[in-house]
């Protein structure tokens, strides 16, 4: 069976579980379960600490896992990114107290930086020729400055609310942009059929989240103009109607552009425009 690691907690956990459920995989029913076998789909799910997933995958103990790109980079393991998953987006930033004179990357020289991602931060500073002390903390790094442990912090920033509440402000360019991703062991062949099935299923979920199915009627004389507005994934499906002057069109369109596309179609003569959500897909 394909061994898959998923986060047991944290901001990536629930979206990861939901994605796997939408892809047809069985999840745990008891929060104390650490391992779930799904023989019908040929997988075994392991619920692990987010920080540890890349380590297990990199060492080959787990075949694939869902983690953050920042966690993968910080792990320094041999695990390989296989595909981005479109959730858990964040930036990794430096932050200093509002009243601090630290405002540029160069100002970090000789300072103390508290972070959970010590390897990522150390490598970034070395790359930019900055010498600083990196202090590893397992969480709540915002408190380190107030407690006198560090001069500044480096941490994942989603909305910035936590930093502002702690009297901190971000500065300098982001160390990196991150999102959730599927990673694989270097021991697992990229062409492995089990990995291919998982990849198709997850990509199908992503497509269903990003696209909708649009149906509309259009005069035959306006079909070319309508197809120019909604070209579809490959090509729209065009069918004749009882009224021989009209055709029915079915096409996939980006969910984010639905209302604008409906307006544009109406302008070129389309009527009976209907949008249907997708539950799953294989492209």
Swiss-Prot record:
Task: Summarize what activates or inhibits it.
Answer: Feedback inhibited by histidine.
* Location in the cell: Cytoplasm
Q: Does the keyword Disulfide bond apply?
A: no
Which Gene3D superfamilies has this protein been placed in? 3.30.70.120, Periplasmic binding protein-like II (3.40.190.10)
State the organism of origin.
Answer: Bifidobacterium longum (strain NCC 2705)
Pathway as given in its UniProt record: Amino-acid biosynthesis; L-histidine biosynthesis; L-histidine from 5-phospho-alpha-D-ribose 1-diphosphate: step 1/9
This chain belongs to the protein called ATP phosphoribosyltransferase
Q: Which UniProt keywords apply?
A: Amino-acid biosynthesis, ATP-binding, Cytoplasm, Glycosyltransferase, Histidine biosynthesis, Magnesium, Metal-binding, Nucleotide-binding, Transferase
Q: Name one GO molecular function term.
A: ATP phosphoribosyltransferase activity
List the cofactors.
Mg(2+)
State the family it belongs to: Belongs to the ATP phosphoribosyltransferase family. Long subfamily.
- What Pfam families does the entry give? HisG, HisG_C
Q: So what EC number does this one have? A: 2.4.2.17
Q: Does the keyword Cytoplasm apply?
A: yes
Record PANTHER family: ATP PHOSPHORIBOSYLTRANSFERASE, ATP PHOSPHORIBOSYLTRANSFERASE ATP-PRTASE
Q: Which GO cellular component term is one of those annotated?
A: cytoplasm
* Catalytic activity line of the entry: 1-(5-phospho-beta-D-ribosyl)-ATP + diphosphate = 5-phospho-alpha-D-ribose 1-diphosphate + ATP
